[in-house]
């Protein structure tokens, strides 16, 4: 109960109580799982920003933990996001490491018109799928489920584009992360809400870094 006692001690500050009060009702296991998932989630985005393959093993750990945690908090859309992330991380890991004549087979590029069409199809197909999931489990509770469904669509597209090393995947992350900050805070997952605030900053930096990298290669070519 050490973690519970630590949270209880810092509750003397009203702002701390406002931010972290819900954690008093959580088990030690839930707090440890969320902290670990947040740590590896941030590490994964940092590696993604610098176009490093370690984005995938760190991401696999974070997403696996979040699947379990989000099921408990009935955020079914985000739970499916992380299950999808897990699968796409395996695909991305393979895709990024492929080489042709000793060179990286799939460098950073922009999305093509056909890929944009595929992205739109994936987005709307995801909205339909997540709406069905919420309805099937009788968890459609208004605005929270609606927002969760929308961000799920953005993140599905973002992960697919990232696995294919497309610059525009960062734009999906930026919008989705901004929306997720109040969503997770409302659900009482303050650490995850703060994580998405950090993700937003990293996504903006990542977008400019990938764009700069792409333009430098284009000039050389």
What are the residue ranges of the model-derived segments?
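Membrane-helix interface "capping/anchor" motifs
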Residues: 46-57, 160-172
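Alpha-helical transmembrane segments in multipass membrane proteins, preferentially the mid-helix core
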Residues: 131-142, 149-167
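Juxtamembrane helix-capping/reentrant segments at transmembrane boundaries
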Residues: 104-121
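Short, strongly hydrophobic alpha-helical membrane anchors
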Residues: 1-31
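Loop-to-transmembrane alpha-helix initiation sites
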Residues: 78-81, 188-199
């Amino acid at each position: 109960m050490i973690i519970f006692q630590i949270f209880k001690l810092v509750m003397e500050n009203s702002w701390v109580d406002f931010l972290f009060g819900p954690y008093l009702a959580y088990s030690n296991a839930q707090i440890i799982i969320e902290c670990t998932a947040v740590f590896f989630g941030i590490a994964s985005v940092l590696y993604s920003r610098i176009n490093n393959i370690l984005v995938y093993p760190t991401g696999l750990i974070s997403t696996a933990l979040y699947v379990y945690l989000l099921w408990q908090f009935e955020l079914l859309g985000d739970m499916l996001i992380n299950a999808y992330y897990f699968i796409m991380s395996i695909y991305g890991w393979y895709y990024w490491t492929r080489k042709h004549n000793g060179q990286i087979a799939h460098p950073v590029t922009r999305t093509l018109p056909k890929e944009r069409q595929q992205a739109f199809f994936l987005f709307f197909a995801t909205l339909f799928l997540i709406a069905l999931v919420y309805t099937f489990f009788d968890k459609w509770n208004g605005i929270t489920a609606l927002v969760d469904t929308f961000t799920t669509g953005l993140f599905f597209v973002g992960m697919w584009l990232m696995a294919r090393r497309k610059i525009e995947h960062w734009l999906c992350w930026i919008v989705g992360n901004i929306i997720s900050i109040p969503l997770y805070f409302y659900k009482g997952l303050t650490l995850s809400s703060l994580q998405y605030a950090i993700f937003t900053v990293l996504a903006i930096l990542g977008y400019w870094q990938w764009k700069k990298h792409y333009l430098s290669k284009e000039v050389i070519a």
